[in-house]
Regions:
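Solvent-exposed interaction patches of small proteins and small membrane subunits
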Residues: 1-116
């Protein structure tokens, strides 16, 4: 079954929300010790990056405030450098970069959902 733009938007939004749920109420130290949580967060970031790559350029250009290259680039690092992933950087990304990104993703989803 061919995936649609809406599917990728849902993937992107859902994975961003998952990372926040997975890390809610835990400390960096707990995150570093809990392999299940860190792996789940890494997987969600991979999904976000893959979905970002699948969103057409004409859509991405309408939302320049979303750091498309950074989102996709994180996926590439996680996939290709999996053995050298620094969990502290993942934690910082989830805690500092994703919270301001989520409202932008939601706005984009709401606007585009009307067109789909």
């Amino acid at each position: 079954m061919k995936r649609t733009l809406k599917d990728y938007l849902l993937d992107l939004r859902g994975a961003a929300e998952e990372t926040q749920r997975f890390t809610k109420g835990i400390t960096l130290e707990e995150f570093l010790r809990d392999r299940k949580t860190s792996n789940a967060v890494i997987r969600s970031l991979e999904v976000m990056g893959e979905a970002a790559k699948k969103i057409p350029e004409e859509v991405r250009s309408r939302y320049p405030e979303i750091p498309w290259k950074r989102v996709a680039g994180m996926r590439d690092v996680l996939i290709h450098e999996y053995h050298g992933v620094e969990l502290e950087i993942i934690w910082k990304t989830v805690r500092e970069e994703l919270p301001p990104l989520q409202p932008l993703l939601e706005k984009m989803f709401q606007e585009l959902a009307k067109e789909l």
